[in-house]
Amino acid sequence: MFDTQREELLWGGRKLVLETGKVARQADGAVVASYGETTVLATVVSMKEPKPGIDFLPLTVNYQERAYAAGRIPGGYFKREGRPSEKETLVSRLIDRPIRPLFVEGWRNDTQVVVTVLSHDLENDPDIVSMVAASAALTLSGVPFMGPIGAARVGYLGGQYKLNPTVQEMEESSLDLVVAGTDAAVLMVESEAKELPEDVMLGAVMFGHKHFQPVIEAIIRLAEKAAKEPRDFQPTDLTEVEKAVLEIGEADLREAYRKTVKQERYAAVDAVKAKVMAALVPEGGEAKFEPEKVKAAFKEVQAKVVRWNILDTGSRIDGRDVRTVRPILSEVGVLPRAHGSALFTRGETQALVVATLGTGDDEQFIDALEGTYKETFLLHYNFPPYSVGETGRMGSPGRREIGHGKLAWRAVHPLLPPAHEFPYTLRVVSEITESNGSSSMATVCGSSLALMDAGVPLRRPVAGIAMGLILEGERYAVLSDILGDEDHLGDMDFKVAGTEEGVTSLQMDIKIAGITEEIMRVALDQAKEGRAHILGEMAKALTAARPELGEHAPRIETMQIPTDKIREVIGTGGKVIREIVEKTGAKIDIQDTGVVKIASSDGKAIKAAYNWIRSIVAEPEAGMIYDGTVVKTMEFGAFVNFFGAKDGLVHISELAPQRVAKVTDVVKEGDKVKVKFLGQDERGKIRLSMKVVDQQTGEDLTEKLKAEREADRNRERQARQSAGE
């Protein structure tokens, strides 16, 4: 019934298995891939006819995690997977980025890649095996895909690179780098690092590229046995159209791209395009070429003109040379009520970044395959359409916004203080108010400034820069701080963030083959130079965290209590903790480890809650005097609340120095009294005394009463002696 084909190899100390022909046989390509006990299903379906009226590749990648893969049932009311999680969105992008450049130019058939996690062993992250499975499914599908690609994760432990470290090993690694590419070239890099040098980062990229070659070979072997016949597709030849466009518009395009203001440049380019269209596709006249071909050729000519200008003259669209960073202005404290804020402007790219400090109540609960965990650092990136002078959809964040936010998160995260030193939940929001390239790196710079403005003790300021590349044969130019046009028309998007000590995040997307290790080294070195310049400009606004938290930020004090006292602090059904919160106004978070976080913008509220909790968990000292309140009277004595939530008994014999016939003759419920803690009886009951305490001054009368009793005994003894004489 099944014509199953299979490839196996030992990779990174674990078995990788690729299998096809058994599951999802109606898809154009389907591969079940397993790594350890993590298993995914990747499918590819591409429509038979091109989608009309579009000039881009209609590729969609969906990565989805199923809770059953880890033996779990989804949370929430419906107990069913819903909208994609952040992890699913990020992995979808991770798969998309290296495969998109490998589709043959001109492919306009709707193509969908779906990767489903079927099993997760909680050791091997599904993202790498998902990329491998998607590559294999595309290679088998018959669509014009110039792969396959391989992918690998690289860690850095004890000064050594580690191929595909486990989830547990990643906790100790100073590097989390994912690299993907073909047998000949690197196409994509995504990473977070703990301030590592550039040569270590580049070494990790090349280490990963070398070690995923066996995976590519396994996919090729599988394709030789199971691949479908290639689709009959011939890319459109635009050679003649491009010649015609160049003849009409090259000079005007070169002039348009000398305009340094973005909106003026766009208007000039649109005018050239209209001139070309009028000449080659005249209204009411005979068209020399199809309109869609002319539009496609014009885009190609645009790219060539920009690239030729840069390679021939070393001068870029806005007049800069290849190494110069646009003018930078950094401002902090721009929003009066925000805990921390910054406005970072670099040329025509601007980010308004706001940092907010919260408490344990504000932590984000994330329901992942590995289980539910809390996230205390959130970074959200918003890209409204007005930032590029357009109208558009507003609403929930798209994939691009989530991806850019995570890139900035990775850049800043390694610099944050540990939770036990700075027990705040942090949320950073970046509002991109203007954009002309490199807005994610503006977010990194603005986030660093906003957090320091809020008083968050970052180890060092962090900055980011976006690099570009123009490659034509043997000639190339690496561009620092690229514009939006240079990003779209160039061959590489290379983002590097870090401090003066090293790199914290590296993201690379390469659109063509031929990017050598040497070119990447030049780009990294040039990025380091640019990053140092940007850090210097940022230092004009702020060089380190402010010594105090923002005026409106909550204050948090932590205390450690014995774990066996947690129940007493919470109380039956939460009664005690609710009372503390209601009466002090402070927020209280108690962790299973006994760490208590008390938060409020009012220092007095924190102190009151702190003392209350301390009184519950602390033990009274024998012989000490405490203020108390009579809470109940009995025939044999009075119960007094005296040490926070502690109650003790003042026996009738301890109420007053003289004999007491009736308890209520001395005290009534609600009376404020002073008591001395005598200790506990054999049953653990607390014993108190009032008679040895001056109820006015709180003075301990024990010695005074003892002296009086001794004097009384002496007088009695003398009286008896006198009577005997």
Curated annotation (Swiss-Prot):
The keyword Zinc does not apply. Its EC number is 2.7.7.8. GO terms for molecular function: 3'-5'-RNA exonuclease activity; magnesium ion binding; polyribonucleotide nucleotidyltransferase activity; RNA binding. InterPro entries: ExoRNase_PH_dom1 (IPR001247), ExoRNase_PH_dom2 (IPR015847), ExoRNase_PH_dom2_sf (IPR036345), KH_dom (IPR004087), KH_dom_type_1 (IPR004088), KH_dom_type_1_sf (IPR036612), NA-bd_OB-fold (IPR012340), PNPase (IPR012162). Transmembrane segments: none annotated. Its cofactor is Mg(2+). Mg(2+) binds at D487, D493. GO terms for biological process: mRNA catabolic process; RNA processing. SUPFAM superfamilies: Eukaryotic type KH-domain (KH-domain type I), Nucleic acid-binding proteins, Ribonuclease PH domain 2-like, Ribosomal protein S5 domain 2-like. Residues 554-613 form the KH domain. Belongs to the polyribonucleotide nucleotidyltransferase family. This is Polyribonucleotide nucleotidyltransferase. It comes from Methylobacterium sp. (strain 4-46). The gene is pnp.
